[in-house]
Swiss-Prot record:
Domain of life: Bacteria
Disulfide bridge positions per record: none
Chain positions recorded as a divalent metal cation binding sites: 47, 127, 131
Assigned protein family: Belongs to the DinB family.
Pfam families: DinB (PF05163)
Protein name listed in UniProt: Uncharacterized protein YjoA
Disulfide bond as UniProt keyword: no
UniProt keyword annotations, A-Z: Metal-binding, Phosphoprotein
Protein species of origin: Bacillus subtilis (strain 168)
Residues recorded as bearing Phosphotyrosine in the entry: 150
The keyword Glycosyltransferase belongs to this UniProt entry's keyword annotation: no
GO molecular function, one term: metal ion binding
Gene giving rise to this polypeptide: yjoA
Quaternary structure and interacting proteins, as annotated: Homodimer.
Amino acid sequence: MCQSNQIVSHFLSHRNVTNELAEKISKDHYSYKPAETSMSAEELVKHILTSFHLFANVIKEGNASPFQNKQEETETDLNVLAKTYTEKTVAILEQLTEEQLDREIDLTSAFGRKVTGRALLQLAMEHEIHHKGNLFVYVREMGHTELPFYQQRM
């Protein structure tokens, strides 16, 4: 399996579970927060979906400019967003080159350090996994008991 296929496969092994959890959130639970200081379920899902896409764009561009170009999302259906952002992120990941993954990106303004594309990809994956764990808690507290394993077999 080539590098880009491995990256996409690993991404989807986690994203498909994130999307499955998002499917369990009915619109009347979009505003659910487990604590006053928590993101709402809707905010959390949008954060997960858009963050990986943003990180992938930073790797593709080789600089922090995508952080400056955050677009407000007008779509309100989490399932539509999950499908759209997953497809857009996969399209970027499929095109990443070894050069882009090995290139050092100056992210001192965002993270206080320079990182390689590969290191940022790892950070993006860990960010997804971290927040997916949060999402499991939200969905359980909404009353769902039939939940997927944290990672899908690919």
